[in-house]
Amino acid sequence: MNQTIPKWAKSVVVAVALLFAGVAAAADKPNILVIFGDDIGMYNISAYHRGMMGGSTPNIDRIANEGALFTDYYAQQSCTAGRAAFITGQHPFRTGLLTIGMPGAKQGLQPQDPTLAELLKPHGYVSGQFGKNHLGDLDEYLPTNHGFDEFYGNLYHLNAEEEPETYHYPKSEEFHKKFGPRGVIHSYADGRIEDTGPLTRKRMETADDEFRDAAVGFIEKAVEDDKPFFVWLNATRMHVWTRLSPEWDGKTGHGLYADGMAQHDYDIGIVLDKLDELGIADNTIVVYSTDNGAEKITWPDGGTIPFRGEKGTTWEGGFRVPAAVRWP
């Protein structure tokens, strides 16, 4: 079986290597902002579907229009594998992060697994990860034990987060203690870990706003401290099971998926505008992509069109995903 690094992951590793091929002053080192959606297909993005599907994503399109739009970009078939491959630059067979991470699972990033945050630290970068992690349940697997200075986010897919609110979930406190999901975690590289409370169905409506604001705050602090930054912002949109606030529910007239994508795009616009406001847009690499293909397949959502298959399959629709990179 071929266990080589995926083509897209190689590109990231090569880009980082080229970035530091020469010795540069700290002020010359570009900031790096990577934004991941969740379960997003190429035709969920209007830069790809050009009006052939429902919904519009002007801010994601802006990254593509001001940079490069990738049409042959591969991730993995599921959340944990796709995120592990990106942040480590390794095939998930090497890390063992092949399946979906669940509450209570003992699998996660190991000390020997490199991360982009660890590789950037010797070059003076501060690194923050915000939003969905899905790379391990235990404290030892948190991003702040793998090169990141700060993490604020959730640890699993949304289905797992809302299970305690379902009628069939066991009522036993012992069961919940062993197998229940942790809340939204705020942790730091110095060992501080705070559980800010469960990611309930209600909180899911605005969780991405929390993660967006935390990322913006981290960027502002890095600029104030005159430090180059690496920020990985992982939205929960547009997971196939999600919860929309009244503000976004029905926004597009094309259903839940398009409404959620509209909110996702809006949040990205706020972050892009912040880069402009801080005067750092021209010195910031912005990457947009996702972990795996979509689960919604056809009009009006777009999803995996024009490819066969969906998330969790080995057809193109399962792992061929949108990607755009801007570096003015």
Where are these regions (language model features)?
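N-terminal secretory signal peptides that target proteins for export/translocation
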Residues: 1-8
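Formylglycine-dependent sulfatase
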Residues: 2, 14-328
